[in-house]
Structures are given as structure tokens and as C-alpha cells.
């Protein structure tokens, strides 16, 4: 089944145009991506290793992230992506909006609009149910360990 993405303008507003996921993006086009930082009650963050079958950054460690589908805002995309990739479903009220950035896509001329969220879990290290097409492994890490991954 095809996934469709909303295209945004330079003011980060939907244009009404759609693009099929995986189709080339035009220079200057923007689409919405979310990242979800999940912290357990011990202060550790959930990191996941991308599946080796992923087209971009296979096998790399990351926090939960994904592309918003057409007609989906950042909050809804964050809730969906976290549930799909990890099995965690703390409910929309647990998602705290951290802010928005823009970042160029890798060599495509387009631009990611990145909405960042934090989820604070009430317990330490709950069980994770990985989505094998997306996630190959997972690990809870201290803030210092996460910082080391980013270097």
C-alpha cells in the first residue's frame, strides 16, 4: 500500500499537494518528520537500531522517528510511530512537544520539517516490541551514552 506525504511551503504550511513516499522530492519541497525521545523513570533514553534493510542509514542507532502521513500532524505521527516501531503506547497526553527545526534532505534538494517530542514513562525500562522492518535492536542508554552516540 502506498504512503502519501503532505508537501509544505516555506512557511511550513501544507500546500494541498501530496507526494508518494519514495518518489523524488522537488528542490525546496518540505515534508514533516517526527522524532520521539523516550525517557524511563531512571532517566535513561530508548535508542533503536535501524533495520539493515532500511534505504537510509541501515544499522545506525537513533531515537524513534518517522515521516508524517498525509493529513497527519506531528503529534499524531509521533504517537503512531512510537507504537508501530516499539509497541509503546503511553497515550497522546504523554507526548511533550519540544520544538521544530528544518534540515536539508540528503542530496535530494528537499527539506525535512522536524517536530521533536519527549515521552516521560512512569516506569523503568518497559518491554519493547520491535517492528522488524524498521528496528533491528533496542537499548536503554544514559544521557552520557546517548551523547557518545551522537559524536
Feature-to-residue mapping (PLM):
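A glycine-rich, hydrophobic loop/mini-helix early in the fold
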Residues: 33-65
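A generic fold-level signal
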Residues: 31, 40, 55-56, 109-112, ...
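Acidic, metal-coordinating catalytic segment for phosphate/diphosphate chemistry
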Residues: 1-35, 41
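A short, polar/proline- and glycine-enriched secondary-structure boundary/capping micro-motif
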Residues: 26-28, 56-62, 139-140
